[in-house]
Every structure is written in structure tokens, then in C-alpha cells.
Amino acid sequence: MTPLELLGLICFFAIVRVAISIKPAPVIAGASGGPTARTVIREYLDAFIVAGLVALFLITFVVRTFFIPSGSMIPTLQIHDVLLVNEFEFRFAKPQHEDIVVFPPPIPSPNDFIKRLIGAPGDTLRIHNGIVYRNGVALDEPYEAEKPNYELEVRDYEIYVDGQPLDPSQANIPPKAMWSAPDRIPDGCYFMMGDNRNDSEDSHIWGFAQAGGTFDAGPLKGERASFTGKAFLIFWPLDRLRVLH
């Protein structure tokens, strides 16, 4: 976390702390009314101290910040949004469909990726005429910027895009022994997509993301493969403050 991001997080919690602590001043006959300058300063100082402690605890043990550098998740996430990511989430629960997940990239890249989880282990997956079908059911996806302009299908132990299998030297496609069935996503593997479907470098290009252990194939075979966490809040800029779904 950069100093600027930490300052933003502290300011966010300070604003919340001040907001919940404001109380109407009692009206006393003959009194001038209103808090003194010293009281106001003490209140704000208290808020920033508490906010700082809360922020330090969270970034040490629970959450991290994530800066959005690209438009692959538009409209849900905008370029320069700063998110809070729950690093505990997947220590106690499995990733769920439609979660917005931060994870190490399965291709060489200096930065973690953030995408939406569309397919989980055991799912069948197909994209036809711009519609995503999971386990044979068309998905309702109000979050997508536009319909995907490619055809895709998980079958024959491969991911086929526009009728061609992904190159196993460039994409993470586990060996057949890891698949429970030729048309179902393998154990430990997830199909990730950006909400900005036609401007997103995601699983239709680099194959599956993996949630544990090491990558089983592709250019990062043997490297760490575990989800970093679940994004749950846009906290900066303040005019975009919202919980993520």
C-alpha cells in the first residue's frame, strides 16, 4: 500500500467515525450554544487516531487495497478506482460465482489481475451468440458492458475460442489427468472474465485461473497459484463509494 492509499483509507474511516459521533448539541436556556473550538479539534483528532488504528489493523491482517489500472472491468470498476480486497475470504470459503476476485496472473505480468468468476470446478461453460451458458443455463449478466463477440466452449479437455483450442504453451490448460470430465472445468480451476467483455484479457485468452498450489501448465507452470482475495468495496474516489456485487 502506498502512503497516499493509506492516507485515503484513514480519511475514509475518519469521516465515518466523525459522522457516527456527531450528536445534536443540547439547548440550554441562556447558553451561547454549540461546541467550543477545543471540543471540535479534540473530536476530529480522536476520529483520526481511531481511524488510523483501524486502518493499520485492517491492512495488516484483513484487507489490502487494489488500484484499477485498466478498463477491463468497466462499467463495474473504472480506471483509477481504489478497492478494498478481503484477503481472509477464501481462507474459510470457496470462491463463488460472480465474485470479483484478485489473483496472481497465469501469464507473465508484474501486477495481479482482477476479474469476475464465471465458471467454477465441475461447471460446463459455453458462449454462443453473445450469451454465456453455465451448466446449460443462460446467465443474466447486468454488469457486463457488452456481449462477447466470440464463441467459446470448454470441451475435449480444452478451451475452444472461435473453434480453435488455446495454445497450451501460452495458456493455462491443465493436463487431462486433472479433468474429471472432458467438458467440465477441472478441480482447482476457475474461468474468469472481465465485465468489459471485448476489451478484457481474461480466461478466453490465457486459460484458467487456479486457486491453490501452483500452476499446472502454461507459461507460469510451477509458479504460485492462489487467489489473493475478494474485492468488496470501492472506497476511492469518494463519489464512487459503493459495495461491490
Regions of interest found by a model, annotated:
Residues 2-31, 35-41, 66-67, 75-245:
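Soluble "head" domains of membrane/secretory-pathway proteins
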